[in-house]
Curated annotation (Swiss-Prot):
Keywords: Activator, DNA-binding, Nucleus, Transcription, Transcription regulation
Localization per Swiss-Prot or TrEMBL: Nucleus
Disulfide bonds: none
Entry's free-text remark on domains: The ARID domain mediates the interaction with DNA.
Stated name of the protein: AT-rich interactive domain-containing protein 5B
Gene name tied to this protein: arid5b
Predominant cellular place of this UniProt entry's protein: nucleus
Stretches with biased composition (Polar residues): 369-380
Biased composition (Low complexity): 565-591, 752-767
Pfam family of the protein (one): ARID
Role noted for this protein: Transcription coactivator that binds to the 5'-AATA[CT]-3' core sequence and plays a key role in adipogenesis and liver development. Required for adipogenesis: regulates triglyceride metabolism in adipocytes by regulating expression of adipogenic genes.
Amino acid sequence: MVSDLRSWKKGLQAVPLKPGVLKELGKNGQREALHKYRESTLNSGLNFKDVLKEKAELGEDADDKKVLVLSYPQYCRYRSIIARLRERPSSLLTDHVVLALGGIASLTNSTQILYCRDTFEHPTLVENESVCDEFAPNLKGRPRKKKLSISQRRDSQSGGARESNGVEGKTLVKMRADSKSGVSKPRNPSTGSCKRVQSENKPKGDGGDECRTDEQAFLVALYKYMKERKTPIERIPYLGFKQINLWTMFQAAQKLGGYEVITARRQWKNVYDELGGNPGSTSAATCTRRHYERLILPYERFTKGEEDKPLPPAKPRKQEGSVQESIIKAKMMPIKRPKDEQKTPRGDKDASAKVLELGMEDMEELQEKQNSQQLQAPTQTDRDPNSPLTEDDEGVLVIKDEDQPVLHNAYEHANGGLLPSLPQDGAQLKSEDCDAFPVAAVPLHHGHPLPNSHTSDQWKHGILEYKVPPSALANVEQSRPKEGQNQVVMVLPTLQQKPVTSPEIPPERVEPLKKEESCFNFNPLLYPRGNPGIMSPLAKKKMLSQVSGTGLLNNYPYGPPPPLVSRRLSSSGTEVSSAGQSSSQVSSSVETSIVIKRPSVIQHAQSFKSRGSEDRRSSTEGSQKDGCSEGEPVHHSQTLIREPYLKRVDPHSSMEKSAEMPRPGQAPSFLSEFYSSPHLHNLCRQTEHHLSKEQISKYLSRDVYTRDSETAQGFPPSQHPDNVGLNFSARLSQKEKGPPPERVTEEQPTDLSLPKSSPLKLPLSTSTLGGIPHAAIQQDIKNSPHFQAGNSQSSSVDYHPRACRVPPMTVSASKKVTESHSKVLEKTPNSRGEESMGFKIDEMSRPILSTKSSPQNICTARPLKRNIEDLENGPTEKKIRAVTPLHCSTQRDLPGKPRTPEADSESVKPAEPAVHINSYTSEGHKIPLHSHLFQGLYPGTFVSQVQDMCESLGSHVTPSYSHPLQYLKNQAVLSPLMPPFAIHSLMMQRQFLAANPAHMYRHQVGTSYGDILHPGLYPMSALHPQPAFSPPQLSSVHPSTKLS
């Protein structure tokens, strides 16, 4: 304020009111009202009462203001009003409307109006004498503490001194805090907090000093102790918008009884109130307790002589996390529960059931630890022994195979243990068990290794030959819960979802389930079971390459090949048997289905497929039947059982099946799949099955083969090639979880001719051979002319293609050629014959291209089934159905090492082909391990790799192979690509056509599947003439689709 107006050279002079107006305002009492209004408005709501009071004490007139400093907006409004009221009476300035619009009624004639455009702060202003802090207005903003009481507000508004108001406010706040925190303990002013004492006794210096002394002593001792404890207090946190006063917090806590008492009584909110925090805080108690625990609790315990315990854990968070984990686990468990619920009691398989339950419990425990594991374990345990359990078990087994080669053996043994009981129900159980390949079965196997297990002779036939040491089984079982479950986590989502459906239809599952289960082993991994047969050429190619590369010949991205009549029958029979039907019933149904569904390379692939329980049953049954007629019934059955794609059937049904279905004569139902993805899958399985059988017969030393397989490259050391196959299948299944076709492409080298080494492939090949040492297979392939041709190029353990012979199966030597021809021609009602017809038709109608994983497709473009004449003709042999080669399946398929169908289906279902190979061997079919056809199909490098792989097997293989499937086996062994021989069928067809189209198509077109399977149907020369083509050739052969 300026007393001398002359000192102001700038500013706007306020329009004064006329004296008459002022007098009237004084008379009406409006002057005082106008004054108050101006004070409140022009001061922007600031409380200048203390300033006005000071001025009154100085004798200055409140109305005698010489200068008004307005904000810039106010100044602008005032100028605008003055401009509008020009030439108007000044009395309008007192109008409330004008005042509201920014008008100012000046009560004096000497008021200057200024405006403040900006505000600033400067260090010198603090010490400037012109700045009177004592006259600063009381800022009214959001209270940072508790609201003032009504009395305090009244005092503040009454005009008390600012200082006295501040003191009163502090005292009132403290009193309220005391009353609040003293709910349990009334607060005593004498023992109040130091802060309160200071505020109350501010005039008393002694009280403040004592409190400060105590506080300083406490803080020194606290900081020292915490530093010695190596937990120094570096920064004091804020609580409720203000920094925590450690001394106040400590005193408040001690008054309430200390940490333990406060925590027990839940009085931390009282401590928070004592600290003067925000009353609206919802986490006051927890935050206060945690700060106390970190900053003061250790010292409190030290002062009380208590042991320095670790700070209490953050219970809420951990509890929440554990609850969430448990919830997730519980949710995961229900996912498997559908299968678990579907599980049917196995009365006749006490040991098997026990093993399954044990495996399930282990799995469940692991599953609890791992959600995916949880899913696997419940599914295996809860699933039907036959259908649900089979599928889930397969899924688990596949994973285990990845983990351990022992899994195949364990599966076989477990299945053996299970199936021995199941065979009592019927071969159906075998098939399903093979399919299921439950981890639980592995424990069973421990109890009684499949080879030694005689609970069911039929099962023994299917699996006994493939022996797995109990220790291996134990390892597999152990790995199953751990590794298998982990892997299953990836696979189970698909597998379990599909298996859940199939378990629901134990008898019906024969149709859908067989497909689904066969696919379930690996198809669910590669492709959803729900889209069988639907696959783009690229997807097919990928699938084929992946299957061959991974050894999952029967892993069809499309899903299981359409169930053969025999396979469906066998599946239904198997399920019926496991459901409780008599073994004979199961056998009959299985026989029918087996006959229709003779084990073939495709069946071998089926064993590779997840759905394998049904497929395995039929293939196993077929293999068992073949084995029986050939004299290797038990081994073949075991091999079939082992090889998931071979349908397992009761020994009777399998024996009947072998009799009924001469593998060579009948076109396997898988041939239909040979063209379409499902059909292709079946074809691969059956072909592989037959090849495995023949190879088994050829490589009688299963043990040797097993050793080789186990020692074979890429095969996890396992006592049984099947386990290896399982491991491989597990890996494959995990890989296949993603879009199967894409995965195949990714996994397989761009050049299909080049085998893509993959741990999965190797295990599959080994398993597929059914225990035949991989080296042995290689040697056999070497020995065979075809293999010799491709030896240098295709020797590669990694790509042990399932040496799958298209000739589905000849149980007996006489049956092989004769029955295969007759059955192909006659379309014998036997499952074989029926299958031959169906497959022939399918094969004729479906180009190999559609085949996903059958090397057979490579050779046969459309005429998967050759006419009997073609079978008789040597050249037809050239039409070799390059069904998914049995890399390891051939080895596994060897009589000595029948793969567990489930294990095979999990890893690769080539084991069943091995069983078929055994039957073929019994029948006298020689399986050329390698053929020039494969050489022609695969580049020299590929063939050499396969040959190298087979070189070890070559010693076991005779140079010439009488059976047309021999070349398939040779091919499978020859080219690591045989699992890749799952090379896209179209590519293979084109390649064959390019190499020697006339031979290939001539053989393919005129022949039936059975004919192809017959030994001697295709001359080895026909295969040999085909020159090996380079990888680029393969690519050119299949230009429409990327091979990688």
